[in-house]
Amino acid sequence: MSSRGTRSSTAAEQKRQEDVNKESNMNDSVTEWSVLEETLLLKAICRGLRPVGIEKNFYMIGILREIRDGCKRSTIKAQDVWNKLGTLYNLKEFEELEAPGNEEVKAKEKRIKSPDVKDFKLPKDILKVKEKSEKPLETSQKVEIETVETKPGEPEVKQETNLQKEKKESKVKLESKEEKISRNLRSSSRSISPVTEQPQSPKIQPVIPEKKEKSEKKESSMTLRKRSVSPSSQNTARSPKRMATEPIEPASSPAASNQAIRRSSRSRRPPT
């Protein structure tokens, strides 16, 4: 019996020594966290990467990725993250909350304590809670409405606010500015680059080949006609108009000559 008791005591002592060695090794292997690494860890937890429950290892991989993406020189490992979370939070309480079917804990609405400020390496200016000012900031603009007296016979006039008036005035100012800019541009363009009107060259109409052929044919026919008519024939030939105007000479017979003499003598006699 004594041998058995000694064996059990030695086994318990060995376990204790192993636990102490593990704790010492963990303390020795703890890496120093920078401010940037701590902020990245807190951001990952706020986004929903909580290493609790059945899928805690997968969430841990996501946390490590975010830390390494944000700080490429970081040498933090999964064990370092576990140790940091163990110092900040009570992981057993987290697991109780995230355990499926744990209705008793949900009914109690158990709340986990937030970590102490001393555990962080963040600067004091960030961790200090600023006191809220007693007077809230007046963000809303006061709109003053002008009252207009209306008589029963007159139509109702719509009440315009100061904001609407300011909008109208700004629109008018913008339009006037645009007009001034356009005028200045026109005057500058005229003074810098005056437009010189060049004489327009006469438009040359293209000659169609068919019309050319017709005109050539007409010219050739006219030249042939002129050549066919000689100058002697032109002098001898009489036009019908000239034939009509010339008087017809009477025939040279003795009877006709006697009659003409009688007529002339009668016309010379004085009247009785």
Curated annotation (Swiss-Prot):
Superkingdom classification of source: Eukaryota
Biased composition (Polar residues): 1-12, 194-203, 229-238
Record GO biological process: DNA repair; DNA repair-dependent chromatin remodeling; regulation of transcription by RNA polymerase II
Coiled coil, from the record: none
Residues modified as Phosphoserine: 193, 201
Residue stretches of biased makeup (Basic residues): 263-272
Listed InterPro entries: Eaf7/MRGBP
Function noted in UniProt: Component of the NuA4 histone acetyltransferase complex which is involved in transcriptional activation of selected genes principally by acetylation of nucleosomal histone H4 and H2A. The NuA4 complex is also involved in DNA repair.
Similarity comment: Belongs to the EAF7 family.
Full protein name: Probable chromatin modification-related protein eaf7
Lineage: Eukaryota, Fungi, Dikarya, Ascomycota, Taphrinomycotina
Gene assigned in the entry: eaf7
